[in-house]
Amino acid sequence: MEKSIKIGFIGLGAMGKPMAINLLKEGVTVYAFDLMEANVAAVVAQGAQACENNQKVAAASDIIFTSLPNAGIVETVMNGPGGVLSACKAGTVIVDMSSVSPSSTLKMAKVAAEKGIDYVDAPVSGGTKGAEAGTLTIMVGASEAVFEKIQPVLSVIGKDIYHVGDTGAGDAVKIVNNLLLGCNMASLAEALVLGVKCGLKPETMQEIIGKSSGRSYAMEAKMEKFIMSGDFAGGFAMDLQHKDLGLALEAGKEGNVPLPMTAMATQIFEGGRAMGLGREDMSAVIKVWEQMTGVSVSGGQ
């Protein structure tokens, strides 16, 4: 990666901050902005240049990364009052790493193209640990030429980098992946409660299913660490999983694709959020079934 390149980073939360820090470790200039002053201070301490608003970041940068909570915020940051697109010079590349719908990305890409700006979707998988270690999986939607331009920068913050297609394709892959994760997690919770109701021990199911056709990433990643321990702090928040299922339903509606299993999983996670579990790991959805049935699985009981 060329050290002379100027990077902008907007959105320095749990994911954005470690990604920006990894870029700084490579010796490039990073212009940073976040509404939370503490987040900006954390990257300034690592050598970043603080900017007072989004436009200042845009005007100073060759490539601008954004990592934001949802599509509404992304669109406001890009095209609202004082937005990024009003201050970018032609030839700038914007790389949005947020989890949003392909339709939102395509809308922003169209506006950007009218100004001579390339707009890329590059959602990630790997969580905060992957962001800190620089080992994220990155799913990129962009033209071949733009992908080649940004790939050296992406390689600093990610390990497995996939050019999956044109603009919007990265968001689509992320949505499909998280649809499967959500449905698998809801099914796992349901199955474990049934097993305990039938007299099985959680440990027995974990061992046997883990070696059988019913095994899944949801079981491998969530069973021992969260469900068996009964500690659901940290991890991938239920609120975020619920949001991603909503994005899948939105894409299905736009494409006339029925998604009945996704709709049901969404309602199950909604039940968990109604119980106040939104900030716990998504595997806390098992508490919905425990409450309905009077069966205890979590905590190895």
UniProtKB/Swiss-Prot annotation:
Keyword RNA-binding: no
Keyword tags: NAD, Oxidoreductase
Class of this enzyme: oxidoreductase
Known catalytic reactions: (S)-2-hydroxymethylglutarate + NAD(+) = 2-formylglutarate + NADH + H(+)
Oligomer and partners: Homotetramer.
One GO term (biological process): nicotinate catabolic process
EC number from the UniProt entry: 1.1.1.291
SUPFAM superfamilies with a match to the protein in the record: 6-phosphogluconate dehydrogenase C-terminal domain-like, NAD(P)-binding Rossmann-fold domains
Any GO molecular function: NADP binding
Pfam family, one: NAD_binding_11
Phylogenetic placement of the source organism: Bacteria, Bacillati, Bacillota, Clostridia, Eubacteriales
Record function comment: Catalyzes the conversion of 2-formylglutarate to (S)-2-hydroxymethylglutarate. Has very low activity with (S)-3-hydroxyisobutyrate.
Active site residues of this protein: K174
Recorded superkingdom: Bacteria
Binding site for NAD(+): 8-22, 99, 243
Protein name as it appears in the record: 2-(hydroxymethyl)glutarate dehydrogenase
InterPro entries: 3-OH-isobutyrate_DH-rel_CS, 6-PGluconate_DH-like_C_sf, 6PGD_dom2, 6PGDH_NADP-bd, HIBADH-like_NADP-bd, HIBADH-related, NAD(P)-bd_dom_sf
Family note: Belongs to the HIBADH-related family.
Pathway of action: Cofactor degradation; nicotinate degradation; propanoate and pyruvate from 6-hydroxynicotinate: step 3/8
Keyword NAD in annotation: yes
